[in-house]
Amino acid sequence: MDSLIAASARALAAGDPLGALKRVALREDPPALALRGIAMAQLGEHLRARELLGRAARGFGSHEVLARARCRVAQAEVALAMRELGGSPHLLTQAVLTLEAHGDRANALHARLIGVRRLLLLGRLDAADQALAPLDARGLPPALAAVAALSEAELALRRLRTGAAEAALDRAQAAAEQARVPALQAEVAEARAALHRPAARCLSAGTAPRMLRLAEVEALLSSPVLVVDACRRGLQLASAEGALWRPLARRPVLFALARALAAAWPGDVDREGLIETVFRSRDPDDTHRARLRVEIGRLRGLLAPLAGIDATARGYALKPSDGRALVLLEPPIVGEQAALLALLADGAAWSTSALALALDASQRTVQRALAELQAQSRVRAIGRARAQRWLAPSLAGFTTILLLPAALPIA
């Protein structure tokens, strides 16, 4: 490695992409192309970074397996930043094995962390937990230790384990300060701020609505009350044996019924009101009433033993088991597309296919939702056809952790 390449690599490790480019900007050899690609990625020029890294990977000879593996890791990180989540992780796994075989522990761990972050974006929390658990960040460069701790913090936040998230963020902050990389320090500060922003609106009979932070939501979900969670679309009841969770995200009609009944608790909701709210019909007939009875029966079966549904003279009322209190958690974002807006709130440009993958929905469904949001000026599109990406303004003032896909209940 010549002195300019070494100096450029040190600049990149310190978070100084401009300093790195000054040393190798005019060079076309594969090591310089790789460093230029990484520098462009740090500057946010991901398309150019992808091009340079591709040229570098093709330029290394077949015998330079370590250099090619490092290029693959950099390409995977650029793909993650561009929210290209549909590719197979097989190449990244191969790169990890090559790096470990050649004793490059730091880059191997970096590659594994890229895989963890991809799983977190896709909402695959169990898989992310399994991938993160065996990783040992001791003895690593501070910047990499900070990334590892940030991944632990994000997983803990998505699991609603705020104490573990705070501890991981403390480790991330210490490592980021030691690394002296401003971008890492800003990322830690933003993650810590999410803990202190409102995360949901709490509605309960006899009390005024109030905003809850994540720690307060965690405490509420651990208390002996029935929680109708409109953020994650389900019902939860904590007990000595553990939390009972009834997911209704894939049953929109049943969830709409549960939500309407919870909003009226301890009172009831008349049949015409339920039909208008759930079936969007202002002129109910016998067909609507029959369908309402069927859906109420389905909901009654799903909610046992958390709650029952009593028929009243004018409609239906939700009755939590054992006379428990009921709380309705409402999301901070108004509208049916809260999870979609929560994904876009990270400021990255997402493709329709990546959004569909993260939401576990069809591309057609996501396209319809994006069209509705675009008509309301809540999202905007850049590019055309396969290059089209979607952006949304940041959602200042509250956190969207509870709205992200697969944000699981407390175990």
Per-region residue spans from a language model:
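Short, amphipathic alpha-helical interaction segments positioned at domain boundaries
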Residues: 325-335, 395-411
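Amphipathic alpha-helical segments of tetratricopeptide repeats
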Residues: 21, 28, 54-60, 93-104, ...
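Short boundary/linker motifs that mark transitions into or out of structured domains
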Residues: 8, 15, 185, 190-255, ...
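"A position-specific structural signal for the A-helix of alpha-solenoid helical repeats
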Residues: 6, 35, 67, 74, ...
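Residue register of alpha-helical TPR repeats
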Residues: 2, 31, 38, 70, ...
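Positively charged, aromatic-enriched patches within helix-turn-helix-type DNA-binding elements
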Residues: 257-291
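DNA-binding patch around the recognition helix
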Residues: 285-288, 292-328, 371-391
